[in-house]
Amino acid sequence: MSASASRDLKTGGCLQGRVKVPGDKSISHRSLLFGAIAEGTTTIEGLLPAEDPISTAACLRAMGVGITPIEAGKIVTVEGVGLDGLQEPQHILDCGNSGTTMRLMLGLLAGRAGRHFVLDGDASLRRRPMRRVGQPLASMGADVRGRDNGNLAPLAVQGTTLRGTIVGTPVASAQVKSAILLAALTADGPTTVIEPSQSRDHSERMLRAFGANLEVGGEMGRHISVKPGATLHGQTVVVPGDISSAAFWLVAGALVPGSDLTIENVGLNPTRTGILEVLDQMGANIEIVHPRDVAGEPVGDLRVKHGPLKPFQFGEEIMPRLVDEVPILSVAACFCDGESRISGASELRVKETDRLAVMARQLKAMGAEIEEHEDGMTIRGGRPLRGTALDSETDHRVAMSMAIAALMASGPSTLARSEAAAVSYPTFWDDLARLHS
């Protein structure tokens, strides 16, 4: 199939079997970054072999870090250059479509005194806000410049000596927090990050494992302090399956009559399990099988069976723990009798696309009744959806969400730009074909 051809989406049938989702995207990025600035070799098992982590690896290679090719099923090794070993690159660092790469690179590079870096990306990334990282870094003495007063790429980073300080983040964002923690490793004194509410904590867990002098305190773990000077040492990292990718199968298994799915080896970090809480609120039949701890992260297998679902509501307080799952939950809401309400989700308007607008547009094309709000949407479920021509609008999470919606529609659908799924889940279409009967 050509890259831009429309894909025929299946309807009807049920989903049965076992599936392993790709490695967690957040943990994949961080294992590459922390391995790069550690002493010695880091080996990474289960790294997500998709476009975004590949962008992170390419940027690190351009600064002298040895990283083996990222291929499905292969262990990746990173030859660390130490905390101050990153070289000034000869070219612009291309972050592709990856907001995580760009935001974490800003923190990584801000304290490289005397070295100059330019970060750029694709058309979508050039529209995404970066001041939320640049501003807190500036309070540490960072010099980050770009379009729209430093908010939009391309961004130039002139490495400076950073000062340790107390930094309040404007939003509960793991990307913002992680950028500051990376910068804090090279500052001239201790740095404390204070979040408005706790975001995913993969960076804190992994930095500690690599040997950083990092403490978590305050209410709900919202105060994270780093003392510079510790040497990071290469580690063996095992990347669990990404719960944000598992979410598509959790919702599909709950929605599609006759379904019984087991999703293996899923990361169950409590800062990421909002999706399980909302599905529980809906009455979904989900069981955690064989919960275990792997390389400092809680992991388990998730079994989901079809059953009736109730409408839901959730808002700002849970949003940091399920921000990437809002698109697929908006699909689930269409099949619950009654009104579901999502609020506190304005962050979705500055993702790869305006995800609230795109999901509302695509689901309305199928006949859904949706009212969009500035920070969310109200969905009146229970109306039958009809198959139609759909478009991912280049967003990976939209592509996979619409594939699940199409399973429940009357009549066939097509999806334009279905290749977007590869950003986080390169084997999604193969897995869907295998599980669908």
Curated annotation (Swiss-Prot):
Q: Does the keyword Cytoplasm apply?
A: yes
Q: Name one GO biological process term.
A: chorismate biosynthetic process
Keywords, alphabetical: Amino-acid biosynthesis, Aromatic amino acid biosynthesis, Cytoplasm, Transferase
* Annotated pathway: Metabolic intermediate biosynthesis; chorismate biosynthesis; chorismate from D-erythrose 4-phosphate and phosphoenolpyruvate: step 6/7
Q: Which domain of life is it from?
A: Bacteria
Leader peptide range in chain numbering: none
Q: Which GO terms describe its cellular component?
A: cytoplasm
**An MF annotation (GO) of this entry:** 3-phosphoshikimate 1-carboxyvinyltransferase activity
Q: What class of enzyme is it?
A: transferase
Task: Enumerate the transmembrane spans.
Answer: none
Q: Which residues bind 3-phosphoshikimate?
A: K25, S26, R30, S173, Q175, D324, K351
Q: Where is the active site?
A: D324 (proton acceptor)
Give any Pfam family that matches.
Answer: EPSP_synthase
This entry's Enzyme Commission designation comes to: 2.5.1.19
Stored NCBIfam families? aroA
Which HAMAP family does this chain map to? EPSP_synth
Q: What does this protein do?
A: Catalyzes the transfer of the enolpyruvyl moiety of phosphoenolpyruvate (PEP) to the 5-hydroxyl of shikimate-3-phosphate (S3P) to produce enolpyruvyl shikimate-3-phosphate and inorganic phosphate.
PANTHER family recorded: AROM/DEHYDROQUINATE SYNTHASE (PTHR21090), PENTAFUNCTIONAL AROM POLYPEPTIDE (PTHR21090:SF5)
Family membership noted in the UniProt record: Belongs to the EPSP synthase family.
* Protein's recorded name: 3-phosphoshikimate 1-carboxyvinyltransferase
Q: Which organism does this sequence originate in?
A: Synechococcus sp. (strain CC9902)
- Which gene underlies this protein? aroA
